[in-house]
C-alpha cells in the first residue's frame, strides 16, 4: 500500500497533537503547584517554569494549526488537561510537569528523527517544532533547581 502525502501529514499532526496534550498536562501541573506556594515562590515558578511552558504550548498550537491550514486539514482547539490529585504537593506536581515535558519532547524528537517533517517539505513546521523543543529544553533543569531551593 502506498504511503500518501495526506497520510504523512495526518500522522505528523497526530504526533504534534500528542506533544501538545503533554504540554497541556505540564501546564496544568505547574498551575496546581503554583496554587500551593507562597507569593514569592509562586512568582518564581511563574517566571522560571510556567512562562516557557506556556510559550511552548502556544507555539505548538500555532504550528499545528498553521500546518493544517496550509494543507487543507482541519485545525484543532486544544483544551486544558487535568493535573492530578492535590495531595501530590508542590514537588509531586513539579515532577508531573517535568514528566509531561519529557514525553512532549520525546514525541517531538521522535517525529523530527523520523524525517517526516522533511518528507512533507514544510520548513515552517520544522522551525516551529524546533522552537517548541528549545522553549522546553531548560525547564527540567530549572524545575530541579526550583525544588532544591524551595522553602529556603
Say what each PLM segment does:
Residues 51-73:
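Conserved alpha-helical segments that form or flank metal/cofactor-binding pockets of metalloenzymes
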Amino acid at each position: 500500500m502506498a504511503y500518501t502525502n495526506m497520510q504523512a501529514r495526518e500522522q505528523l499532526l497526530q504526533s504534534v497533537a500528542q506533544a501538545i496534550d503533554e504540554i497541556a498536562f505540564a501546564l496544568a501541573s505547574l498551575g496546581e503547584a503554583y496554587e500551593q506556594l507562597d507569593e514569592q515562590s509562586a512568582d518564581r515558578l511563574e517566571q522560571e517554569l510556567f512562562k516557557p511552558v506556556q510559550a511552548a504550548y502556544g507555539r505548538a498550537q500555532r504550528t499545528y494549526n498553521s500546518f493544517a491550514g496550509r494543507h487543507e486539514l482541519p485545525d484543532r482547539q486544544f483544551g486544558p488537561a487535568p493535573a492530578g490529585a492535590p495531595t501530590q504537593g508542590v514537588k509531586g506536581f513539579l515532577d508531573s510537569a517535568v514528566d509531561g515535558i519529557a514525553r512532549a519532547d520525546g514525541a517531538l524528537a521522535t517525529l523530527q528523527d523520523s524525517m517526516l517533517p522533511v518528507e512533507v517539505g514544510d520548513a515552517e513546521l520544522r522551525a516551529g517544532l524546533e522552537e517548541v523543543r528549545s522553549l522546553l529544553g531548560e525547564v527540567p533543569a530549572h524545575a530541579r533547581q526550583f525544588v532544591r531551593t524551595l522553602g529556603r
